[in-house]
Amino acid sequence: MIDLLPTKTLYLPDQPVLIEVRGDCPPGAVLTARHLGQTQAECEVGRGVADLGRLPVGGYGVELCDPDAAVLARTAVQVAADPRAVLRYGFVVDYRPGRDLTAVADNLRRLHLTGVQFYDWAYRHADLVGGGEVYDDALGQPVSLDTVRSLIELCHEVGASALGYAAVYAVGRQEWAKWEHDALLTASGEPYALGDFLFIVDPAAEDWIAHFTADVCTAVARVGFDGFHLDQYGYPKRARRADGTPVDVARSFVTTIEQVRAALPGSRLVFNNVNDFPTWASAAAPQDAVYIEVWPPHVGLEHLAQVATRARTEAAGKPVVIAAYQHVYDSAPAQSADRATALSMATLYSHGATQLLCGEADRILVDPYYVRNHTTEPSTAALLHRWYDFLVEHDELLTAPGITEVTGSFAGSYNDDIDVTYPDTGTPVGHSATPGAIWRRITQAGDRYVMHLINLAGQGDTLWDAPRNAPAEVGAGTLKIRRAGSEPPRVRVADPDRHPRLIDVEVTLDGDFAYAQLPAPHLWQLVLIDPSRATHP
């Protein structure tokens, strides 16, 4: 088996793109980098590190082929002028002294994770670095700051940012007496809490915010983080402090972000909008992404799409990350859970967001307490490898800030500009996530159109965190495009499971319309439409 591992999770324009080739490579094997299916660079390779040179900004699929053009292995790379414009988010949770970090580095490189959340690295929630060099965290997990620093160094070596976890308003029992005057209280006068061990204060209380900002600054100085994942628990929305002061918690969160940014002007900050609260207020605050952790009532694929779409509207170009924990792996076989994860990724990627899911060496998130994670089975690891490669390779068609949805303006019988049918099976095509149908979405990316076809045929519902059936075969699709001139359009398709690289399909002309026969979709098919071959030959 041959494995391709980029040396970086993301490359800058002045960095050569280097690919480590692991395994026995046949003589004459060639490594090729393609941008949207078009060859940009290639080189002959053997064992070791292959140099594809410097590449222009963009996403690239990278294939290793033998002399007969058979594909031996694939990966992807992205070149970006601004690393903070991209966030493919991962996590680590294990800080035991002396642990081997090699497999963690491999996973970051394989899945192209550009940011890593250091979950529960701190001594206490209200005293981040007060435990010395070796301690147990608030829930008894062992932490060595030497291991934390080694993980940070590892992130830097592969081009990822290391973000320390910090809850913006949580205080443990040991520190509570010092801070209970800032408590946020229920109507009955009890302090809001998480379980029975963390109590909630007003994050914008003057003395608390001074303490919190000093604590994160000390953590940067002593440990070396590139920034922070600023957490909250989604409640309360409004409350009173112990002194009777009414608190609009959304405003307090914005104040907190502003104060942390003032204290750490060069750091990368990501705030958690739990269940979309308060994205409308926090998205414009001085942070580097819009991050949302979803819970009921966001239970369906369409709910994920709605959350991602609203977030992109508020984000003003910042990357959007959705934390959607796939609890399904705890209760279902890997095969049906993998399909649930694939449909979650298809929904989020096609709506311009990424998913916080993967981390450590081989783990995925199935619980909000990240220490309770799930070890991936081989099928899951292979799925994630394929789909994360696909995300990176087609980034400018998926997550670029300027992408606009045009489904309602182009599809359907009234518009009749771009649409698809499945004549062999009569499978319905819809504007929303509907069981038994193809979910069709059309976006405009520059002067191109992108059609996303998510196959929900064979599903009895559209829950994103439930076991999924094998997708039903719907047959080939007939794509219909209203022509914009005498030049025929160019149509290409890609599928993360069946043909990850964009390939051309034949286009025929009939009066004012062009038609193309699309391969049968599996779970998600991306169709790239160039209205004129003269523009994109």
Predicted regions and their residues:
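An acidic-aromatic substrate-binding cleft motif
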Residues: L72-R124
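Aromatic-lined substrate-binding rim segments of carbohydrate-active enzymes
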Residues: A122-V171, G244-F253
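The substrate-binding groove and active-site-proximal loops of carbohydrate-active enzymes
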Residues: V86-R99, V129-L145, L194-A210, G234, ...
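Aromatic/acidic polysaccharide-binding cleft in carbohydrate-active enzymes
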Residues: Q232, K318-S413
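Active-site-adjacent "subsite" loops/lids of carbohydrate-active enzymes
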Residues: P83, V93-G98, G164-V223
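Carbohydrate-binding surface patches
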Residues: Y422-G485, Q525
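Active-site neighborhood of glycoside hydrolase catalytic domains
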Residues: A204-V290, W295-Q306, A315
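C-terminal beta-strand-rich structural cap/linker in extracellular carbohydrate-active enzymes
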Residues: L509-P537
